[in-house]
């Protein structure tokens, strides 16, 4: 396989990029944006080498702890649990939450072989106890897997003195947090509901 074909194939690993889109990107870079293409390659290499997960919340960072976990001005008694770093970014862009985060890196899905340990629920419980969290906001996209995950988290924390709430309605069923506008996220956070199981 030649360099052109390898690059087209490599770009297809991105979500929503099929063979035609990948080919258009490659031709555009080669014909009009060679310097930017080299810059893109350099940025990708640096990101893949240096970005890892925050030891406390699992968000992306180049350090041991991410900037959100290091920030002393954030409310350390309030913890927002999300599925992915993209959800952290979406909530931060809404400017409606000043607490800390915990990124599950997925949700419980037996069909995909993901159980409570695979998404970090024991680490979540340890964090809640260690940091004396008073409220956990479950900000998971509405789906069957999310409801299963919410149930497991509630069971995991049933003996702890912590309030558990989840985002209010307004987030469409099957919708992903990262694609919602800031007003919808802000409204869902403000109108979150306590979970009674």
Swiss-Prot record:
It comes from Legionella pneumophila (strain Corby). GO terms for biological process: DNA recombination; DNA repair. GO terms for molecular function: DNA binding; zinc ion binding. Residues 77-172 form the Toprim domain. May play a role in DNA repair. It seems to be involved in an RecBC-independent recombinational process of DNA repair. It may act with RecF and RecO. Keywords: DNA damage, DNA recombination, DNA repair, Metal-binding, Zinc, Zinc-finger. The lineage of its organism: Bacteria, Pseudomonadati, Pseudomonadota, Gammaproteobacteria, Legionellales. This is Recombination protein RecR. Signal peptide: none annotated. A zinc finger (C4-type) spans 54-69. Belongs to the RecR family.
């Amino acid at each position: 396989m030649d360099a052109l074909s390898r690059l087209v194939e490599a770009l297809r690993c991105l979500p929503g990029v099929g063979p035609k889109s990948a080919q258009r990107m490659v031709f555009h870079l080669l014909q009009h944006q060679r310097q930017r293409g080299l810059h893109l390659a350099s940025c990708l290499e640096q990101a893949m080498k240096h970005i890892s997960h925050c030891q406390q919340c699992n968000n992306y960072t180049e350090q041991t702890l991410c900037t959100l976990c290091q920030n002393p001005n954030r409310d350390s008694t309030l913890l927002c649990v999300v599925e992915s770093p993209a959800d952290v970014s979406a909530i931060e862009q809404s400017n409606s939450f000043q607490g800390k985060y915990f990124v599950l890196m997925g949700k419980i899905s037996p069909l995909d072989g993901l159980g409570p340990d695979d998404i970090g629920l024991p680490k979540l419980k340890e964090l809640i106890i260690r940091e004396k969290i008073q409220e956990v906001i479950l900000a998971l996209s509405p789906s069957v897997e999310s409801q299963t995950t919410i149930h497991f988290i509630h069971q995991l924390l049933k003996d702890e003195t912590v309030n558990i709430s989840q985002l209010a309605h307004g987030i469409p069923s099957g919708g992903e947090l990262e694609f919602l506008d800031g007003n919808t996220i802000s409204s869902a956070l403000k109108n979150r509901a306590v979970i009674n199981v």
